[in-house]
Design a protein with these regions (language model features):
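A structural signal for isolated positions on well-ordered beta-strands in alpha/beta enzyme cores
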Residues: 55, 132-134, 290
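Electropositive phosphate-/nucleotide-binding environments in soluble metabolic enzymes
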Residues: 2, 6-9, 13-20, 33, ...
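Metal-dependent amide/peptide-bond hydrolase catalytic core
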Residues: 3, 213-397
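Non-cysteine beta-strand/loop elements that form the S-adenosyl-L-methionine
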Residues: 77-79, 188, 347-353
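Acidic/His- and Gly-rich active-site-bordering loop/insert found
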Residues: 2-104, 109, 113-128
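Active-site beta-loop-alpha junctions enriched in small/polar residues
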Residues: 31, 81-83, 138, 166, ...
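Residue-level recognition of well-ordered beta-strand positions that form the cores
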Residues: 66, 189-193, 258-260, 292
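Histidine/acidic-residue-rich, glycine-tolerant segments that coordinate divalent metal ions
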Residues: 63-64, 84-103, 109-110, 121-250, ...
Length: 397
């Protein structure tokens, strides 16, 4: 057990086993974005067991639980995600996914367990205020936070908080930073239309594969040579589809990728650059090139007041050594950003790595957590909710 876990009150020990069992059940039963019916049913059952009224509209929606003590008092929200990811699960066989093609590779099973653990503590000793528990669908692939916003999850909410497990830090550390926590994420699809031909007669064809390869390398110069390096940005081509046989010059090729930026000016610059380069490449090689740019999640920008609440709560609950920060925003993306377009809030990270583990990245088929973090997260969300509600009530004239 970590030093931080040992600092938790004794009554948390009685909940720890239930938390581990719940998290392992969720881990064994992963469901993909907008198809989380079984997961949602388990969350509803847990909330009902605690006597917390909740609603769930069915597949495609999320679960909203409301612990209301006084309508005149402030309301805050705690958020977790229901969905998992496609891919094989190579974690502990004792709780490995029962499905061959999907797993909780991003820790959403842990997030649900933490927020439900906090719900149990808050229900047992109601706070001076109201708490909304948001269990959203489709964080990974569909911007499910917007579904929850449309469903009224933020009505009357003063601020919202969410955490995310990571092996970047050891268990016992909680990381938060002012301002940007994550990057803006956009996607692109480039279709190259050339002219097919025989591999022996390239002069009679327009090789879509060669043009695609040139595009891949040229696009990287947008970051390395045309963007201010003090503002991080990443262009990734993650998928290429082209060709039918080794001796046939491909008539078409398709590239799909992502763009990650940290400020709007860099984003606009890269979007314009991709348009310019695709148009020029088509003209240069006498090919038709079609570009489709799709807007992704905005950056998560933590608000100063809520960052202060998180930092104070970490220090008071676990001591100053538990608090850490990061020198720059993560280049990952998070649809928690949509909530922050409506209300203030803060997004932070829970270290979840055992001392003997080598860090494993999120979305890896081997990503797992030190289950000691479950009690830490539940206790922290409980304390944060109480501190935030007290703070907002005190600030109300």
């Amino acid at each position: 057990m970590t030093e931080l876990a040992q600092k938790l009150p004794a009554d948390v020990d009685a909940r720890r086993q239930h938390a581990v069992e719940l998290r392992r059940w969720l881990h064994r039963h992963p469901e993909l974005s907008f198809n989380e019916a079984e997961t949602a049913a388990r969350v509803v059952a847990e909330l009902e067991r605690l006597g917390i009224p909740c609603s769930y509209p069915g597949p495609g929606g999320g679960v909203i639980g409301r612990l209301e003590t006084d309508p005149a008092m402030p309301t805050i929200a705690l958020r977790a995600e229901l969905d998992a990811l496609p891919g094989a699960d190579l974690t502990d066989p004792g709780y490995r996914s029962i499905y061959a093609d999907r797993m909780h590779a991003c820790g959403h099973d842990a997030h649900m367990t933490m927020v439900l653990g906090a719900a149990a503590l808050l229900a047992e000793k109601p706070p001076d205020g109201n708490v909304v528990f948001i269990f959203q669908p489709a964080e990974e692939r569909g911007g499910g936070s917007r579904v929850m916003i449309d469903a009224g999850a933020l009505e009357g909410v003063r601020a919202i908080f969410a955490g995310h497990v990571t092996q970047e830090w050891p268990t016992g550390k909680i990381m938060i930073r002012k301002g940007g926590m994550t990057a803006q994420s956009d996607r692109f699809c480039i279709t190259v239309k050339g002219k097919g031909g025989h591999g022996a007669r390239p002069h009679e064809a327009i090789d879509a594969v060669v043009i695609a390869a040139l595009l891949i390398t040229t696009l990287q110069t947008l970051v390395s040579r045309q963007t201010n390096p003090v503002h991080p940005s990443v262009i990734t081509v993650g998928r290429i589809v082209a060709g039918t046989a080794a001796n046939i010059i491909a008539e078409s090729a398709e590239l799909e990728g992502s763009i990650r930026t940290t400020i709007p000016e860099t984003r606009d610059h890269i979007h314009k650059g991709i348009r310019r380069m695709t148009e020029a490449m088509g003209e240069l090689h006498d090919a038709e090139i079609h570009l489709e740019l799709s807007e992704g999640y905005p950056p998560v920008i933590n608000t100063p007041e809520e960052v202060g609440l998180v930092r104070t709560c970490v220090r008071e609950l676990f001591g100053p050594d538990a608090l850490t920060t990061a020198p720059h925003a993560s280049m990952g993306s998070e649809d928690f950003s949509y909530y922050l377009q409506h209300v203030p809030g803060a997004f932070f990270r829970f270290g979840a790595r055992r001392p003997e583990w080598e860090p494993m990245p999120l979305h890896s088929p081997r990503f797992d957590i030190d289950e000691a973090v479950l009690a830490i997260g539940a206790e922290f969300f409980d304390a944060l909710a109480r501190r935030a509600l007290h703070h907002y009530a005190s600030a109300t004239p």
